[in-house]
Regions:
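Extracytoplasmic copper-binding redox domains, predominantly the cupredoxin/blue-copper superfamily
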Residues: 2-14, 19-107
Length: 107
């Protein structure tokens, strides 16, 4: 195989691997409704995106207990977070501390 042919084959392999990795990532939706996260617990994989939609008329946050991320969701807006590591992630709303959620993230 020529050098050009080998380069093309490597390029195709890289593009396919990248596309497969992107295709496997999911978007998981959580609603902020009636001062609660719905669903309160979700399962995700590393690389998945969690999208919170604030359906309430007041602002909320999705704030990790370990303070590694803090998302402000204005009324009728969405915010998102890409899961970066496996494990249990507890989060809450800073404005409404009884509003709690959990992400169970796997590799």
């Amino acid at each position: 195989m020529s050098a050009v042919g080998k380069s093309a084959a490597v390029l195709v392999a890289v593009v396919c691997a990248t596309a497969a990795a992107q295709a496997s990532a999911a978007t998981i939706e959580v609603k902020m409704t009636n001062v609660a996260f719905e669903p309160a617990t979700v399962s995700a994989k590393v690389g998945d995106t969690i999208v919170w939609t604030n359906n309430d008329i007041v602002a909320h946050t999705a704030t990790s207990r370990d303070k590694s991320w803090d998302l402000n969701a204005l009324p009728k807006k969405t915010v998102s977070f890409v899961v970066k590591k496996a494990g249990g992630i507890e989060y809450y709303c800073r404005y409404h501390p009884n509003m709690v959620g959990h992400i169970e993230a796997k590799d």
